[in-house]
Amino acid sequence: MIIRIFLFSCITAVLLAKPYRGGELRTIESFQYGRFEVRMKSAPGSGVISSFFTFHDYWSEGHTSSVYWNEIDLEWLGRYDDKIHTNLIIHDQWDLPDISDITFNPNEDFHTYAFEWTSEYIAFFVDDQLIRWVDNFYIDSMYREQKIMMNIWQSTSVEWAGSFSTSTLPTYAYYDWVKYYLWVDGTGNAGTNNNFILLWEDNFDSWETNRWEKATHTWDGNNSDFIHDNVVFMSGYMILCLTTPSTTGYNGDPLSFNETGLPNTFQMHNAYPNPFNGEVVIPISLEQSQPLMLDIYNTYGEYIKTLKNGMTSAGKTRIKWNGLTNNGLNAPSGVYFARCTSIDQIITQKILLMK
């Protein structure tokens, strides 16, 4: 059992005493129930933890007793290249950890991870595939509002996280976006049994200070202090950094996540929200700068609108469609196809417009 005692108060720069520096980003608002989703690439390195989770910040309410504890965890242990750690923690620090096997290395590429939290169950997903379902008595005690959090830190638990070497540093976790869906119990359009509907998403194009705050704290078992400089917004990503005290911040190439930092081929990622009403975003990644055309067609193959036609820079771009035709008219509800053409490749994706 991994016991983590958070020390959220009385931590100042004067008291920084840990040998390493980590980072944490958290929402200002708290949430009760919903679907919590992230697209990210975790940090490699034995002894290194990167995360996406929710936590009831009882310290900020003036409580010190762990009887108020509620937490739902997705954690990546950098020692593994084929596993993900999930956990539930309720009052008095009762936890329910589990390690799940996955078919890829989460430290090498971006994938989508999510958990659904309702009054009836908590479920964890990797690339929309269910990996864990919990509907026992833990769910009855998981009712307190929680903040969305992401952090990177160095664990002192060798048994759990593995042995650590300073030569691992610096190491980084990359976050592409976060989405929050309301739980609407069968009346939504996303998640299990359409139980959820998208409320907001953040693409990390910048630091939305009305939504997120950077944390400065630590806890027993965490060998790093969280500092503002190790939460970096760059090139459409939020990057969490684990560093030495003398090399804080992000010192890598933001466009070289694999060595190149870019996908190995031209890619059109999943459009979101999909279905949509108002505006849909179509993420595109290119290995190198090249001409790109993105057109919308209906199910009869009729041309609707050109969204992009011209030279596109290497890296990641997001192309939006507001549901208007090339003539400025509102397209009717229905199925449409986004067709993206590059120098040597054509990719088509179905999108659904609902009004």
Predicted regions and their residues:
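Sec-dependent signal peptide recognition
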Residues: 1-8
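Hydrophobic h-region of N-terminal signal peptides that target proteins for export
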Residues: 8-17
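Flexible, active-site-proximal loop/turn residues at the rims of small-molecule/cofactor binding pockets
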Residues: 12, 58, 184, 313, ...
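GH16 jelly-roll
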Residues: 18-254
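C-terminal outer-membrane/trafficking sorting elements
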Residues: 260-272, 276-355
